[in-house]
């Protein structure tokens, strides 16, 4: 039985065993999804700016934690991008990211409002828990699916970070001096954030990462088309256990039993939804 390594917080790109890279073991669908993921992770500074506005006045420790989270997320993007550049020398992280940033910026990132788009700081942290649940399970799936050793290591390191980020936001949710949100309100926020996975962020990042600039005219961006392609590439890595873990973390964030009926039902529905998106 192989025991997966335990990756601690605070790693850098120098800790990754790049010399073990094996181009013969690259899986094309994983390469496509890693390219897109690199752009999303590398976009962390915008999220940091937004969260610092929302949490202004909460104290230096909270702001420092948000800034540290952002540094780690951006590092994830650099690590994934470096691997993708090794796997496909035609891919350039900075060039693809510039195209992505030019075409994708959520409205609440551009504003100056210090109120969360979720309605409260607690609501914002529930949404962040949903995201970290998704990324933790996603990189766990890539780690388990990859036969290329460097990608498996990077994905394992990122998955461990994302789980720690989930715990950070879970604790911050309960630390806010705001009224406790009701269960149905929390569930509504969580479901709403899950549905946002159909927005332009994932589809457009997949487009920018996998369609070279010189092919833009022949292959224009179509959200529905590239959302489906992104979903298909992701499903190549996922197994049901990864979805079940994701759902358990989300259900815990909204205050329900992570091993109860809601988690079981949500796991079935989400798995079916992902299968449908990838067809």
Each predicted region: which residue ranges?
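Non-heme di-metal
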Residues: 1-279
């Amino acid at each position: 039985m192989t025991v997966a390594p335990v990756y601690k917080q605070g790693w850098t790109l120098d800790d990754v065993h790049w010399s073990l890279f094996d181009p013969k073991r690259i899986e094309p669908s994983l390469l496509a999804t890693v390219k897109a993921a690199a752009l999303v992770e590398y976009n962390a500074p915008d999220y940091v700016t937004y969260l610092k506005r929302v949490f202004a006045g909460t104290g230096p420790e909270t702001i420092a934690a948000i800034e540290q989270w952002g540094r780690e997320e951006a590092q994830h993007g650099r690590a994934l991008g470096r691997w993708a550049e090794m796997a496909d020398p035609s891919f350039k992280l900075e060039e693809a990211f510039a195209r992505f940033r030019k075409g994708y910026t959520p409205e609440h990132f551009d504003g100056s409002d210090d109120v969360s788009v979720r309605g409260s700081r607690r609501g914002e942290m529930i949404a962040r828990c949903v995201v970290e649940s998704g990324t933790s399970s996603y990189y766990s799936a890539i780690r388990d699916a990859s036969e290329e050793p460097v990608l498996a290591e990077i994905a394992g390191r990122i998955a461990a970070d994302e789980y720690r980020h989930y715990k950070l936001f879970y604790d911050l949710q309960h630390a806010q001096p705001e009224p406790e949100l009701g269960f149905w309100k929390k569930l509504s926020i969580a479901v709403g954030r899950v549905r946002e996975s159909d927005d332009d962020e994932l589809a457009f990042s997949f487009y920018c990462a996998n369609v070279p600039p010189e092919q833009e005219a022949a292959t224009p961006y179509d959200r529905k088309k590239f959302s489906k392609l992104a979903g298909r590439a992701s499903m190549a890595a996922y197994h049901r256990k990864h979805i079940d873990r994701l759902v358990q973390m989300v259900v815990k964030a909204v205050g329900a039993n992570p091993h109860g009926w809601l988690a079981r039902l949500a796991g079935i529905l989400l798995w079916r939804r992902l299968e449908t998106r990838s067809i």
